[in-house]
């Protein structure tokens, strides 16, 4: 497919002021290792045969990335390609040829789900970041967040998603799933991801969030009791787990007497604060707030892609911070 600009596209590209969307897409264009990502999907992507010629794999991958960055459904992504020139240019498409429709966009997503390729992309990108010296292994921060799913029964099956469950946090009930993550303490990059129903206890997945090379593990009070767990008995690390809020409140009643213990809690909090960065990126930057699909597998595929892109977004932030300080 030729990547030629139409008159409208060329007029757009010659205007002076860059929009925020253009600047963002330009940064992502440069940071994403496209060839590495294409190689993961290529063995599974349809080859050109006697039928309709498929769109270039990289074009479909670029569209898939934009869907996650802007939290767009398949239909909204199709509309955006027609309406927004910067997104068309990023996908290497132009208005003088056919643009992928929502079914084509959906089929690409189904291909990734079917072969669990988002998980492979997550591993590939993390290996690439580790080889580049961005991701370290000294410490792991662990955390989990509840992701709400539609709780209405007003659908075709007249029931809620059976793979999602309800759980109570504080005084509030939530229905949905949980994303458990292990984050590199130095860079704030996510190295492990496990998805479960929302009623899964955070501690049950802790072992699956460790890579085995860390010297310390940092977590909030929800992970109290980790060192005593049978499956974690062989894990030789320093456990930096926050005390329960009630105990911290008791310590603060006698600040002078408990000064050291209080300072240790502040130190633990400052270390684990970085675990919030990946969640903040996917929720605030990418606009992900609710499970879009039915079943854990489809949502796991979306979350694996979101955390892959969040790691690359974070790597870009780190590069720009370094450039500003030099």
Swiss-Prot record:
Transmembrane segments: none annotated. Keywords: DNA recombination, DNA-binding, Transposable element, Transposition. One of its GO terms (molecular function) is transposase activity. One of its GO terms (biological process) is DNA transposition. It holds the Pfam family DDE_Tnp_1. One of its GO terms (cellular component) is cytosol. InterPro entries: Transpos_IS5 (IPR047959), Transposase_11 (IPR002559), Transposase_InsH_N (IPR008490). Belongs to the transposase 11 family. Involved in the transposition of the insertion sequence IS5. This is Transposase InsH for insertion sequence element IS5U.
């Amino acid at each position: 497919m030729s990547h030629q600009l139409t008159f409208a596209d060329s007029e757009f590209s010659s205007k002076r002021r860059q929009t925020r969307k253009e600047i963002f897409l330009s940064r992502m264009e440069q940071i994403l290792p496209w060839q590495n990502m294409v190689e993961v999907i290529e063995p599974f992507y349809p080859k050109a045969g006697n039928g309709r010629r498929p769109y270039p794999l990289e074009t479909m991958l670029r569209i898939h990335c934009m869907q996650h960055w802007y939290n767009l459904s398949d239909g909204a992504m199709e509309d955006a390609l027609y309406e927004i020139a910067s997104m068309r240019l990023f996908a290497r498409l132009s208005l003088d040829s056919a643009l992928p429709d929502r079914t084509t966009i959906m089929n690409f997503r189904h291909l990734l789900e079917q072969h669990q390729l988002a998980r492979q992309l997550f591993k590939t990108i993390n290996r690439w970041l580790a080889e580049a010296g961005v991701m370290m292994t000294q410490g792991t921060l662990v955390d989990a967040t509840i992701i709400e799913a539609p709780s209405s029964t007003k659908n075709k099956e007249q029931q809620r998603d059976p793979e999602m469950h309800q759980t109570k946090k504080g005084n509030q009930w939530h229905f949905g799933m949980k994303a458990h993550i292990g984050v590199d303490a130095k860079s704030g990059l996510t190295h492990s991801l496990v998805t479960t129903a929302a009623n899964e206890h955070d501690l049950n997945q802790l072992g699956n969030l460790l890579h085995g090379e860390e010297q310390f593990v940092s977590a909030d009070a929800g992970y109290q009791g980790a060192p005593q767990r049978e499956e974690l008995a062989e894990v030789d690390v320093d456990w930096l787990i926050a005390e329960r809020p009630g105990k911290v409140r008791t310590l603060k009643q006698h600040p002078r007497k408990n000064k050291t213990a209080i300072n240790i809690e502040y130190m633990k909090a400052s270390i684990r604060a970085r675990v919030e960065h990946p969640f903040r990126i996917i929720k605030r930057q990418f606009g992900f707030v609710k499970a879009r699909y039915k079943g854990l597998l489809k949502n796991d595929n979306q979350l694996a892609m979101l955390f892959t892109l969040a790691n690359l977004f974070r790597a870009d932030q780190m590069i720009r911070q370094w450039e500003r300080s030099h």
